[in-house]
Amino acid sequence: MRFFKAVILTAAALCGQFLYGQSNNLTLDQATQVALQHNLSVVQADASIGSAQAAVTAAYGGYLPFLSASGSWNRYSTDKAFSTTTNLGGGTFIIPPSKSTINQFGSGLSANLTLFDGFNRQGQVGQATSRSVSAEQTAVRTRQSIVFQTESAYLNILRNNELVKVADENLKRDNKQLERITESARVGASARADVYRQQSIVAADEFALIQAQATYDKSKADLVDLIGLDVGAEYTFNDPSISLEISAGQLDSTASMYGSFKDLEQRSLAARPDYKSAVETYNAAVSGVTSAKSTYFPAVNASAGYSLGTADALSNLSDTKTINWGLRISWTLFDGFATNANVQSAVANRRIAEIGVVQAERDVYAQLKKALLDFEAARKQYEVSQKGVTSATEDRKIAEEKYNLGAGTLLDLLTANAALVQAQVNLVNSVYNYITAKKNVEYSIGERAY
């Protein structure tokens, strides 16, 4: 409860800041908190919990008596317009015209209680309870999924921002090189063809920068849409807690922190809400078989009633009192195989749900295995990309010095520069791949609660 209050207050504070323009920067934690409050998938999942819990209450209501109260008033008016003659005891009597009005009042209270219905109530309660738990687990997994999607989208923004910086630095570097080559060609120290070649490289750099900027802007729009904010508004995304530098100690510690795969399998099965939801779906199907078989048994109901009535004034309502009670036993001996069809359908649903549990278990193992493989690959890629940037930086420096001294060609310099840009891109990608892969492992285990 404290957590949800904190989330609501944080979201309200953020919305207030956006509304009054005090701040439009979102950190990763703020983005996830806003997503948990405004993402429509989360809202829908939470709404389904309320519906499922109401069904549980209704199922338990089957154990309670049904009570009803009634009241009535009827007015009867009789008008005999003509006299009538009747013979009675040997004599003849004339009944003159007459008018009469009778008011009839009544009230009653009745109760009906199911004593036994072939275990149908037990099945209904079991189904409703399991479905309620399944809805809760689905909502938990939905929150985990939205948080992971938000984290991935946020990290993708930071990645694209770094790639924009790489493209911008490369453009500036090539522009400076173009100035040197142009000046060198003006004094006759370089060929005019080198100028044209460098100009084409600068144009390609400008194109790459425009493309990188567009990708960055679109990734921001994707995140804003995901967390449920106004896509038309402008936001910045910066989180000082996310560093591009990953030490060797961090790499080694994270590589060994998860333990063996068997241990992770057990942790995942114990924690994954989607697996728990599949198990509860199976439990609901088992209860469904119980309910379907209930028609094979007799049903026993008890009833009682109390009523008041009068054919006079309402003040005399208690003149006639009636009390009734009794038991009713009913047993369907043959219903055209309808019960058998219902049972077979329920058994089939139970089997389908059982297969769903097995499939959910396989999915947990497969997702966990792939997440660990991606994490290990990202760790190795980061180590390699660091070496690549160091080597490419030195190679480009040497190629530039050779070209300036006339000992190297422009092609050698362009090749070295392209290798440096690619190495920088690889480093940026490897950093964010590593962070994302680590969060994916946590998401695959499913232990984090929100």
Spans of features found by a protein language model:
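A small-residue-enriched
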Residues: Q33-F116, L229, E265-G336, A341, ...
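Short segments within alpha-helical structural elements
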Residues: A47, G61, A204-V231, K387-E447
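Sec/SRP-type N-terminal targeting helices
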Residues: V43-A47, Y60-G61, T101-N103, L115-R143, ...
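Short, charged, amphipathic alpha-helical segments
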Residues: T129, R192-I201, L410-A418
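Terminal intrinsically disordered/low-complexity segments used for targeting and assembly
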Residues: M1-V34, T84-G90, Q213-Q266, E442-Y450
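Periplasmic alpha-helical coiled-coil/stalk elements that build and connect Gram-negative outer-membrane
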Residues: S145-L264, D374, A378
